[in-house]
Structures are given as structure tokens and as C-alpha cells.
């Protein structure tokens, strides 16, 4: 999920099988999400991205740089090396808005169960929840 700084969802990825980690097809997934945001006439130049250590890959950091996305990604200590990347711990604390949005989504029991086997139904349930979240914020 990509949210704005208030936690309002802007884009959602397609469902990914549970046996994959966060970084599986990450660049392709985020690129598709960014294109969806741009189709809505929302500018993504200079987009600021907070992400946890699960998204700390060289390929994803390069993607962010190429697409003028300012990344603030916690370093994954399991990668075995400390890169020369800037990381702002104060700004990283703002990442809670995405976690809060995830908690809001968990309030929708149809999504929480996650046994939906039809991809279109899963996506539709998420988009419906996003609409409710947006309406609550207005």
C-alpha cells in the first residue's frame, strides 16, 4: 500500500502469494503502483518514501533514484553490509501512518480473513475499504 502523509491509501498492489518475502518483484510491483497514482493526476516527482528493512535492496534503491523518489529505507542488517545510504530516524517515525492504515484495513473483517481466492474480489474488497477510509477522513 502506498499512502499519503495522512494515511489515506493512494495505491494498492496486486495480491502476492504468502510464500514470498516483501522484496519479491518489488520494483515491478511499485512501478505499477506509481503508474496508477500518475493516472490519477497525482504528481510523483520528489515523492518521499518511508520503508522498513524488508525493502532494503540495491535494485529498489536504484529504482527510487531513477524515478526521483526520495527513499528513507531502514538498512537490513541481514544483508551483511552497511551501505552509504542516508537514513533519517526522525522522518522514519512518520511511517506509523502506513501501519495505522493497515490497522484500519484489519478492521474490515472480509479483508482480514484473507481466504479470498479470486484476485479481482480481493482487490475490490481492498478498494472498497480504501473508499471508506477516505470518506472517514473527509
Model-flagged regions — what are they?
Residues 7, 99, 128:
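A residue-level signal for conserved active-site and pocket-lining positions in enzyme catalytic cores
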Residues 1-41:
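Electropositive, glycine- and tryptophan-enriched low-complexity nucleic-acid-binding patches
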Residues 38, 43-118:
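Helix-centered, glycine/charged polyanion-binding patches within enzymatic domains
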Residues 125-138:
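Charged phosphate-binding loop/patch that engages nucleotide di/tri-phosphates or the phosphate backbone
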Residues 22-25, 97, 124-127:
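Catalytic-loop motifs flanking and including active-site residues across diverse enzymes
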Residues 20-23, 57-58, 122:
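Loop/helix-junction capping segments adjacent to catalytic residues or to phosphate/diphosphate-binding pockets
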